[in-house]
């Protein structure tokens, strides 16, 4: 489940019309949400608040062997007036990412209201969208994470991320720190990301290309696109450590028009299309990624069988070590509706009417029940999701996320043998699903990986 600050950053991207799907880093986002989800560690409590439309705070307290926690602050020049902040009102599907429906590429909005350079306004609301976020993790060694995000233009975004860790108490050296700079350029048809990290002076580039018509030059009579094929690649180089890395990938996904039969053209004046074509299919996403340097090949297939049920699978193979990885997972959403009687309007005299009915019950006849119109009952809908993930070594993860009263609760458990045979595979594959696979103890002695509960409340 996303924490409150990640949810606010998601609202910032939506408010500034930034497409998160049009990036190479989001190529396998659907499979990662269904297969690489994390379970809570022990007990953790989150208290958050959107104090003003521009300022948010969050506090975290957890027990992982010892008491730890964090304090977070966020400021944005873009007001979050239309972003629900109460934990009872936040849509659960935004906090619990699952199957991610890829949207068709769109051209950047040229008359972007948050760019003072484009509309030549000097009011505070017309300033370029900027977000500042800082998190302090405690206890020692204290770690500070800071984020600076700024929309330079409708097609460009600048991100600065800083991570600083305080040294040992007796050490007189300066705290270790690293800076990651990322410049993103998105035109709808393609996107480029340029990265630089002070850690080993690492340079990087990521790019994604969408096949098909250019959204910047739309045709008036063009039919809605039913699918999207994207190709991308990334490359990294460090002159200090002589580190070289690269990967490439493909993604094929259905678009919302393919899952709605009514959106398909049903008739036309041309004779060739006299027969109605009702096109409707299940939303699905296919990806293929290749890392030539490590010889890793990975394919994923994700399917939304119904609005409340999704499946995903991943198969990986390493041509150098001949090791393979197979992971399968699913998510099941459950909606429960409780009949709640509508609240009657209270004018403050109901207590007096009850007294009169008690005193004159026999003298004053009550009106027939049929003459009094019944108040319609209201439906109170609550959602919850159950995620299950299993790999070829029978390591199982179960995660339940839902809303209890006004609290957001996430409970998970990890099961599996203590030995994990595919640890070498996960170390050689970028973004593998074995991040939590390592466990202690002898093989076969324990099947418990961990259990935890996370409780969140926001206002």
Swiss-Prot record:
GO terms for biological process: establishment of mitochondrion localization; mitochondrial genome maintenance; mitochondrial outer membrane translocase complex assembly; mitochondrion-endoplasmic reticulum membrane tethering; phospholipid transport; protein insertion into mitochondrial outer membrane. It comes from the Eukaryota. It is a multi-pass membrane protein. The keyword Transmembrane applies. Keywords: Membrane, Mitochondrion, Mitochondrion outer membrane, Transmembrane, Transmembrane beta strand. InterPro entries: Mdm10. The keyword Mitochondrion applies. GO terms for cellular component: ERMES complex; SAM complex. It is found in: Mitochondrion outer membrane. Lacks alpha-helical transmembrane segments, suggesting that it resides in the membrane via beta-sheet conformations similar to those predicted for other outer membrane proteins and porin. PANTHER family: MITOCHONDRIAL DISTRIBUTION AND MORPHOLOGY PROTEIN 10. Belongs to the MDM10 family. Component of the ERMES/MDM complex, which serves as a molecular tether to connect the endoplasmic reticulum and mitochondria. Components of this complex are involved in the control of mitochondrial shape and protein biogenesis and may function in phospholipid exchange. mdm10 is involved in the late assembly steps of the general translocase of the mitochondrial outer membrane (TOM complex). Functions in the tom40-specific route of the assembly of outer membrane beta-barrel proteins, including the association of tom40 with the receptor tom22 and small TOM proteins. Component of the ER-mitochondria encounter structure (ERMES) or MDM complex, composed of mmm1, mdm10, mdm12 and mdm34. Associates with the mitochondrial outer membrane sorting assembly machinery SAM(core) complex. HAMAP family: Mdm10. This is Mitochondrial distribution and morphology protein 10. It comes from Aspergillus terreus (strain NIH 2624 / FGSC A1156).
């Amino acid at each position: 489940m996303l924490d409150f600050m990640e949810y606010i950053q998601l609202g910032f991207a939506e408010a500034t019309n930034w497409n998160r799907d049009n990036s190479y880093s989001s190529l396998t986002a659907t499979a990662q949400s269904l297969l690489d989800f994390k379970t809570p560690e022990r007990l953790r409590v989150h208290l958050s608040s959107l104090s003003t439309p521009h300022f948010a705070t969050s506090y975290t307290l957890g027990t992982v062997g010892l008491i730890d926690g964090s304090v977070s602050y966020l400021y944005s020049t873009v007001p979050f007036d239309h972003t629900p902040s109460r934990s009872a009102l936040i849509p659960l599907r935004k906090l619990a990412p699952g199957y991610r429906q890829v949207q068709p590429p769109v051209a950047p909005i040229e008359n972007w209201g948050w760019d003072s350079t484009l509309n030549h306004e000097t009011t505070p609301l017309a300033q370029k969208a900027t977000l500042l976020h800082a998190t302090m993790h405690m206890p020692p060694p204290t770690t500070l994470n800071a984020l600076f995000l700024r929309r330079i233009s409708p097609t460009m975004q600048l991100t600065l991320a800083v991570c600083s860790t305080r040294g040992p108490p007796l050490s007189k050296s300066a705290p270790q720190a690293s800076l990651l700079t990322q410049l993103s350029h998105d035109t709808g048809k393609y996107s480029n990301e340029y990265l630089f990290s002070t850690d080993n002076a690492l340079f990087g580039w990521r790019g994604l290309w969408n096949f098909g018509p250019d959204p910047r030059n739309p045709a008036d009579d063009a039919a809605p696109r039913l699918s999207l094929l994207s190709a991308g690649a990334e490359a990294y180089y460090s002159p200090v450590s002589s580190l070289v890395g690269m990967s490439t990938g493909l993604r094929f996904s259905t678009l919302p028009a393919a899952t709605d039969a009514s959106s398909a053209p049903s008739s036309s004046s041309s004779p060739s299309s006299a027969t109605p074509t009702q096109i409707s299919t299940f939303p699905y996403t296919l990806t293929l990624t290749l890392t030539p340097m490590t010889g890793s090949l990975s394919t994923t297939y994700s399917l939304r069988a119904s609005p409340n049920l999704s499946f995903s699978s991943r198969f990986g193979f390493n041509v150098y070590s001949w090791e393979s990885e197979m992971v399968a997972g699913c998510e099941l959403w459950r909606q429960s509706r409780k009949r709640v009687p509508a609240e009657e309007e209270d004018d403050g005299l109901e207590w007096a009417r009850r007294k009169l009915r008690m005193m004159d019950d026999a003298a004053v006849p009550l009106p027939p029940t049929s003459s009094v119109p019944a108040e319609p009952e209201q439906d109170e809908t609550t959602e919850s999701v159950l995620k299950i993930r299993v790999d070829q070594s029978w390591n199982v993860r179960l995660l339940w996320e839902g809303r209890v009263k006004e609290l957001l609760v996430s409970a998970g458990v990890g099961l599996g043998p203590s030995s994990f045979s595919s640890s070498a595979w996960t170390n050689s594959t970028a973004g593998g699903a074995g991040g939590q696979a390592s466990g202690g103890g002898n093989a076969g002695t324990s099947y418990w990986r961990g259990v935890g509960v996370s409780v969140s409340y926001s206002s």
